[in-house]
Amino acid sequence: MKQRLLFLGPPGAGKGTQAERLCAAHELMHLSTGDLLRTEVGAKTPLGQEAAAVMNRGELVSDELVLAIVENQLKNQNGGWLLDGFPRTLIQAKALEPLLEELKQPIEAVVLLELNDAVLIERLISRGRSDDNESVIRNRLEVYREKTAPLIDHYRQQGLLQTVEAHGSIESIAISIEKSLC
């Protein structure tokens, strides 16, 4: 099975759930950029302090800072990894690639979890988050598609993209992902 992976997909497609399962089953390091940021901030590392200052101003953490945090995690990593939540744009992907090349850890596969909007909206509303109403969700899906479409094309052109239909049980989706990575 391929060992250096990216997960892409719209909000509600099950990326986090499937990433956790795959990482546990194959001893991959799960690199969720949101979790990494929170860990760095909590540990009060220099990168974490820089990220905290930005987040406390209500701003988005820069691509450069996220890349530095990802690099920090990967430079001591000998085994496989799954990057979840980054890159989200083509610009981020093009910044990530030289770093991975330098570390001699190129991406081996990109898993795109796809699901129709009706199911995504239903899943997100059922989570019960206060900001998950239908109009907000539709807007998030539109932003996702706008930002991610060029990224999907980029990985498709590189021959890395594996598309998996994320409809069905957690187990059946996990099996489809596993098959796509062999």
Swiss-Prot record:
Indicate yes or no for the key word Transport: no
Which SUPFAM superfamilies would you find in this protein's record?
Answer: P-loop containing nucleoside triphosphate hydrolases
What terms describe the molecular function in GO for this protein?
A: adenylate kinase activity; ATP binding
Annotated GO biological process: AMP salvage
List the cysteine pairs that form cystine. none
User: Pfam families, from UniProt?
Assistant: ADK
**If you read the UniProt record, what top EC class would you report for this enzyme, in one word?**
transferase
Which keywords has UniProt assigned to this entry?
Answer: ATP-binding, Cytoplasm, Kinase, Nucleotide biosynthesis, Nucleotide-binding, Transferase
Q: Where in the cell is it found?
A: Cytoplasm
Where along this sequence does the record place binding of AMP? Answer: 33, 38, 59-61, 85-88, 92, 129, 140
Region (NMP), start-end ranges:
32-61
On the tree of life, the source organism's domain of life is Bacteria
Which residues are listed for ATP binding in this entry?
12-17, 127, 168
Among its keywords, does the record have Cell inner membrane?
Answer: no
Mind telling me which GO cellular component terms the entry cites?
cytoplasm
Q: Which residues cross the membrane?
A: none
Function summary = Catalyzes the reversible transfer of the terminal phosphate group between ATP and AMP. Plays an important role in cellular energy homeostasis and in adenine nucleotide metabolism.
User: What does UniProt say about this protein's domains?
Assistant: Consists of three domains, a large central CORE domain and two small peripheral domains, NMPbind and LID, which undergo movements during catalysis. The LID domain closes over the site of phosphoryl transfer upon ATP binding. Assembling and dissambling the active center during each catalytic cycle provides an effective means to prevent ATP hydrolysis.
Q: Which family does it belong to?
A: Belongs to the adenylate kinase family.
Which NCBIfam families does the protein's record reference? PRK00279.1-3 (NF001381), PRK14527.1 (NF011100), PRK14531.1 (NF011104), PRK14532.1 (NF011105)
Q: Can you say what this protein is called?
A: Adenylate kinase
